[in-house]
Structure formats: structure tokens, C-alpha cells
Amino acid sequence: MKKLLIVSIMFLCFSYSKKEFIVSIEQPYEKKLDGLKLEIFLDKKKVKETNLKANNIMPSYETFDMYTSNEGKHLLEVKLKDTVFGYDVKYPEEKYIIVGPYLKKNGKIQMGILKQKEGFIFH
């Protein structure tokens, strides 16, 4: 009986899998974006706060995990300065996400996003 209980507890522990989004923040090339605070929210909850580090030599990324309790559609919000960019993301169809801030020619900030089911390969 003890063995059955232990096996069932182990099965429950291993069968429980955390649902997570893998998010990579592309660091900007523009020096005007250096040092700006970037905040990321998932379903209105803050999950990440970081400062951008401009780099004009080669692309660099800051990667982190965001956990969610259920599958389906979620709201991903990226706040940079006083602008909030909102995106619908679906778990598990869009598990891997890259966000990247850019400056338009008129000086306004634009946020780019890539979403896909499989992981990105960075060279």
C-alpha cells in the first residue's frame, strides 16, 4: 500500500508541468534607448522589469520565463517610457516570444514582436 501511495505521488509530481512562455528581449541598437526601463506584464501582472542596454556591435538578448496557469489566450503588455504595447499570445501555439524596441524615423518608439511554437536559434 505504501509503494502504491509513493508511486502515485511521484506520478502526480511528474505529470504536473508548468506552462511557461519563454521571452527574449532584444537589446536596442539606438543609443537613445540606452538605460530606459522596460516592464513586461502577463494578464495585467508584472513579471519582469529591466533596463535596456544599447549595443551596436552585435545583437544581444535577455531571456526569461513567464509562467501561466492555463492554456489559451493571454494578454502580453510591454511598457517602455509612457507607452504600453499590448499583444495577444496563445499558449502553447506561441510559447517562444522575442520583443525588440526600435526608434522610428520620426523619433517615436516602436515595439516589434515575433511569436512561434518552437524555440528561436540565436547565432
What is the role of each PLM region?
Residues 64-66, 75-76, 86-89:
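Beta-strand-rich interaction surfaces with strong enrichment in secreted/lumenal proteins
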Residues 25-36:
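Structural motif
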Residues 90-123:
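Extracellular beta-sheet/turn segments enriched in Thr/Pro/Gly and aliphatic residues
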Residues 41-72:
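Tryptophan-paired
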Residues 70-82:
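A short, solvent-exposed beta-strand micro-motif common in secreted/extracellular proteins
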Residues 15-19:
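Bacterial signal peptide processing site
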Residues 34-38, 74-76:
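Short beta-strand/loop motifs in extracellular/secreted proteins, especially
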Residues 4-13:
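Sec-dependent N-terminal signal peptides
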